[in-house]
Every structure is written in structure tokens, then in C-alpha cells.
Amino acid sequence: MLLDDPARPRAQAPGRGRIVILQPRRVAARAVAARVAWERHCPLGSEVGYQIRFDDRTSLGTRICFVTEGILLRWLQDDPDLSDIAAVIFDEFHERNLLSDVALALAKRLQQTRRPDLKIVVMSATLEAAPVAGYLGGCPVLVSEGKAFPVEIRHLDLPDDRPISEQAGEAVARIVEAGDPGDILVFMPGMAEINATLGACRAARLTEPLAMIPLHGDLPPEEQDLAFAPSRLRKLIVSTNVAETSVTIDGVVHVIDSGLARVARYDAERGLGTLLLEPISRASADQRAGRAGRTAPGVCHRLWTESGHLNRAERNTPEIQRSDLAEVVLLLHSLGIADATRFDWLDQPDPQSVARAEKLLRTLGAIREEVPPSAIGDGRRRPDGTDRTDPTDPTDPTDPTDQTDGTIRHPQSPIRNSDLSPIGWKMLRLPMHPRYSRMLVEASRLGCIPAAALCAALVSGRDLLARLGRDDKHISEARELFEASAESDFFTLMRAFQFARNSHFNVEQCRRYGVHAQIARQVQQTFEQILQLAGRDLKETPAEPPTRGDDALPRCLMAGFIDQLCRRRDQGTLDCDLTEGRSGALARESVVYNAPLFVAASIREISSRAGPVTLLGLATAVKREWIEETFPSQVTAAIEHLFDRTHRRVSAVKLIRFQDLVLHHEHQPAVDPAAAGRCLAQAYSKDYFELPQFNHEIRQTSARLNLAAAVMPELELPPVDAAAITLCLGRAFSGLTLVKEAQAAPLRDAFVDFLGRDRLEWLNEVAPAAIPWLGEKKLKLLYPEETRDEDARPNSPEANVKLHEIFRLKEHPQICEGRLPVRLWLCAPDGKRLESTLNWPAFKAAVYPKLKPALQKKYPANVWI
């Protein structure tokens, strides 16, 4: 419809007015492009093509281009107006991928500003259309029933606790034994389950030979194509959710659905990413079932019960609400969008995730802390910090044709209100997580791009080395040949990868050393891709002589993972401290067990008998001097006073910190008297020692003042809270360094001076420690430390009185100028509490007559009026 629109101009340069169709996965982009090219009777790459990462099948004449979301975002960096694109179609939008939400928001922004002619289409078979239509300004909603065949849904009668691969293998066997024709598509959550399912089917001795084909995103294109190619045998395709949407596999009439998927989630509070095995939503289950009805009536076998189906979530959680947002926030900063929480999203991201991403980017040095007016106000500086003085410079943002609404005109030109640093602009050119791009930017400076690219490839996928059990001692001993350096666990991985490559990724040879041959092959592919990217977008510059050689790669790893800097607590432990008050334990298999400082590329949480443990892996030893040279603005030195709990004294120490993590300390010969006093006071507030002289009288004075402040708010009295007491003690302890000195200090006088004698005299009037009582006696009051009760009403002070002695009392005692009654606890002659009252006359008239008979009987020696 869009391609053949008569209003669409045709007399234009090749490539102008293209239609771009976004697909959530590379497999889908390739497969759908091939299908559409076949339907349009044109070679793939001519009128219809696709472009995915490292694979471009387009030409100047391509009018329909299928791409993944990352490609469109890359185009937006290079050409923020998308000047050669007429329409952007978001296919399978119900999956709510992170980059699809970003791309839609940016496309909408572009349409509302400089490209009102840009057409935006959002498509899905299961999407709830109304919210999206409203987000796009109330756009029309078109419904097409399409051509689909009926699909019978079959659930389990009872839950099955067996491994999901075993259940799937049994379901395949039933289909084959029943003689039901048609290809079989099995959905599994990951590669391990795919291999287990194929193994179960091979072991089942099926009565019919099947073409068993795995399908997942890590396979090379030629192996993925086997799932779509004709076969003389019935096909059994075992796939991840790459086959859930977009692609049609001709001949599939049976779907076996595990109902599971691996979902990436990000814990913004702890900064940990996890890959969790979770039940899919009902919408995803419907999509999977639909694969059985594309070319003929089919059957979907769900490996869960019908009642269990109703308990599943209706739709997927948008990825933007559960993902690490660092890469997206970097992109938005490049477009002049400094606050992602105020951007016009379809669904708002978690503010805590945005804040975590911002902090990471600032830590990596991608965002300027403070941008001088000369850098962004008039746009006269390049990303490398040099001035633009040539008025004919084609990248000059002050060119009259440039826009001034916060968008980029050139991929390397800073924009008004953009606060990316020169490092940030370089990172932006590398489509990968900012940790890896920062590592490669540093590698370009130090002259070790290939080694850094290999490290990025090793850490960006699954584990290369198998986790060893108790029975794998022979593998552990054989693997020792990889551990030739105690500088970095990456060196171990690099040697293991080199071994796999030298053995031509032979599965049996790799298995003997606990190396995953298939993963090593994927590392090789990723390494080549990253190397190609880095070679295109980064210029390797010769390193300074002192930083060449053995230090170069560890420095790069430090640059990329500096926010995960760890300090060993002492030489005899694996326990470590990290920034932001975090802690963890170095993995026992790490070779970096002697390093006092290291960065951890892997942080994961495991369960133990003592509770959750944060495990620090893929460690690289670093030096304090490297941190100071690479991140000078984040390293501080200050003399601080610390309390030594062992020796019960205060010491002055010079602390060198990266952010809040102590890197080094040096004891100082002298202490500052006031600082030492404050340190002792803070130690007391943390219950590190006791103060016998901080007695009941002082505590009661604090409680009296706080209660008066609560009852008489118009006086605006400052409360005596924990902070005030710490301040008072700090003054009292000035010049002291030992606990025994603090315990001998005259605290009562210090407390009186702190509060002021005038205030204490006033306090004795409105909230006295004791009140006149029945003549010359004084009645002591006990003031509560909590000034208000559960209903936020002021808590009255209390006093114990003997019931038989107060019949002469005419008026109930009150404090705070009559605003608050005293709570009288009426006691028996032996002192036992009977009742409490806030109104003695009312109690005497209404309640006492009911108590009197029992009191007369129990205490006959006393007079009961």
C-alpha cells in the first residue's frame, strides 16, 4: 500500500523515499525480506533488501528495507532527519523490545518537528492497539483478519515435573507414532534446552526419520536457513523465540510449546543484570500457537495445564521497564535529551534504571560533569575539544542550514545542549554496551584494539569454560595450562579461546579441557565483528611508552569496568568492598587472588546456606596509579578521622578514594581536636561504646523538649533528635581521642550549654520534670521518648499515684500551658497499677464506683471514699 501509493513521488534519486520495516530479530529481517522479494518477483537486494548487523543486502535501488531496530537508531545518529526515508513500519511491536520503544519515540519526535511527512505504522497481531494509537495522536487503527487456519490447543491434564526437554521429546514421539503429517516446531527457552530436546528425540528411536534442525540467533545464517529450506524428510525444528513472530516456516502444522523463555532483567538498585527462566505471557503463547496455522490447520501442544495458562501474565513487560538503559541513555544524550525520564515514551522507564545508567556513563567519562558555555552554548567546539574557526567547515553546527532544536547534523558534531564528552562521542560510534565501547576507546589510545575486541567478545556471550564439578578433577588439571598469568581471568579465557581456535573448534578436543567449542566459534564470529566495527570507527593511535605492553590490556579492562572496582578487605580473605557501599566475594577459581585492587567484569548473585552471596568474577588486577591517571576527577584525597573499634580510639588517616571506595590509607601523626570529637560522637551513635553519664536525666530533658515542640508547634522549637545529640557530644568530646576519655567527660554541663539555660528555664515551666502535688509534695513525670502515638497524637507524660491518696485532687494535672493532660496511673496500696486516666474527675465519677467494692474487700485497711 505504501510502496504503490500514487501520491508517493517516484521521480527521485535512487534510495529516496524508502520504506523501512523494523523487525525484532535478525532471523526475521532476513527471512521476511526474502519472502517479500519473492512475492515482488525481484532479486533480494534490489527493490527489496535487508540490513542487519554485519550483513547488508541493499542497493541504491532498494525501496523496501527490512532492518533491526539498532540499524535505524544508527541511521538516526548519522542523519537525524531520516531524509531518504518516507515511512517507518514497526512490525511485531507487541514484543516491546527496548530499541523498538526508543525508535518509535524518536520517530514520533521527528514527525512532530522536522518531518511531518514521515509516515509511522505500528503492526502486530496481538497488540492492544488503543494505547499506541493514543500515543501517536489518535491515529487510525486498521484491522486485517489475514489468512489463518484453525489451530487446536491442547494442554496437559496435570502438571509434569520432568525436565522440559524430556516432555517435549515425548510429545514429538506421540505425534510421529500417531502418523499425523506435517513438520514440527518446538519452542525452547535456550540453546541448552534445544540441544537436550534434540538429544531426547534422537534417543527416542522414532518410527520415522526426521530432519532435526536447531534454530536460534547465534547460528550462522546458512544454518538458520535450513529451518526454512525444503527437506525430503519431515522437519523437526527446535527453536528459541526467534520463530515466534514474523517468520513463516512452510509445512509446520504441529507446535510444541515449552511455555518458557529466558528474560533479561536488570536490578537497578544493585546494578546487577540477570537472565531468568520465566513463563511466557498469554500473548506470546498465542503467537507461538499461531505458527501451526500459517499454511494449514494445525495443533499446538502446550506443556502446561489450562488452569496454569490463566495464571500467566496477559502480555510481556516492556523491555524498557526491565533492562539496563545505559546504551539508550548514551544515545539520548547525543541527541540533546539529557533527562530520559522526561522524554515522551509510550511507557515510562524505571527512574532508578535511568539514574543507574546516568551514573555509569558519568563514571565511564562519557558525559561531562559540567559543560562550559563555550563547549555547548555557541557550538564552536568539536568533540575532540578543538575549536572550529573555519566558517566553511561542513560539520560546523552554526551553519545556517543547521537545526537548533537539539539534534545532530553530523555524526561527529556536538549539538546544542548535548553534554557528551569527547570519549562519549567515540563510544557512541560503537553499537554495543558502553562498558565495551569505553574499553575499545581506551584500546585505541593504548594501541591494543585486537586484544580488547577479543575480551569484549569473550564477555558478551555465554561462558566459554564449563563450570567444573567434583568429578572433573582431570579437566581442572588439564585446564591449568591456560592459567599462565595472575593479572587477569581474561588472560585465561584468551588462552582457552586460542586453544579452541588452534584445534579448529574440535568438539572432542575442547571437551577434554572443559571448553565449549560452539561458544568458542561464536566468540570468533563476534570478535571479527567487533574488530571490524572498531577498525571502522576508531583510529588506533600509538600508545605512550610507559603504558605499552603488559599493562595496556588490563588498563582497557579497567576503563570499561571501573564502576565495578573492588578492594580486598585483607590479604587472607576473598571478601571485597565495592563502590556505593556494596560488597562481594571474589570467585574461588579466579587467578587474581593476590591483587588488593581489581575490576570484576562479572557480578552475579548466588544462593548459599548463609543467604544470597554476590560473586565477583572475570577479575583483572589494577593499580591505583592507573585509576588516578584515567579517572582523575573521580579520585579524591582527604584526611579523615576514623574510630578504631579494636583499640577504642580515634586516629587521623589520609584516605585516597575512587568515588566512595577507599583505595589507600596513610596514618597521620596529629589529629584535629574538633574532628576527633565528632568522630567519637558518631561512634557512640553507632553503639560502638556506652556512656554511663549520658543518664536518665539527660534523656528525659530531651524528651521534655521534643514533646513541648510537638504540642506547641507555633514556637518552632528545634527537636533534640539523634543528630542534635551527636552534635552536642561532638562539642563535648572536642580534643578527646580515647573512649575512656569520652566516658569521663562532664556531659550534663555540656548538654545544658548546648540547649541554653534560657531555654531550660522556659522548659521547666511548660514541661516540668515534676509538678506540685497535693500540698508540698512533687510528683515526678516520666516523658516518653516517642512524642506521638500511632494516631499521630502527642504522647502524654506519665506518673504513678496511689488511688486511695488522691481523692482530694480537684483538677487533673496538665502541662504545656494546659494543652496536654498528664497520664495518671492509678495504683493499689501495694503499688500495682490498676487503671490509667487523662481525666481524674470523670474517672472518679464514672469508673471508680465500679472498682470500689473490690478494692474495699482486698485492701480493708485503707479508706475508700
Per-range role (PLM):
Residues 370-384:
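Intrinsic, low-complexity polybasic segments
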Residues 533-570, 589, 632, 642-865:
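A positional "C-terminalness" feature that preferentially activates on distal terminal regions of long
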Residues 218, 392-398:
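Extended, non-globular interaction scaffolds
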Residues 79-94, 258-266, 271, 275, ...:
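Extended active-site and interfacial segments that coordinate phosphate-rich ligands
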Residues 46-52, 215, 557, 574, ...:
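Long, charged, glycine-rich C-terminal linkers/tails
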Residues 1-370, 417-439, 446, 585, ...:
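P-loop NTPase motor module signature
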Residues 209, 214, 256, 264, ...:
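Second RecA-like catalytic domain
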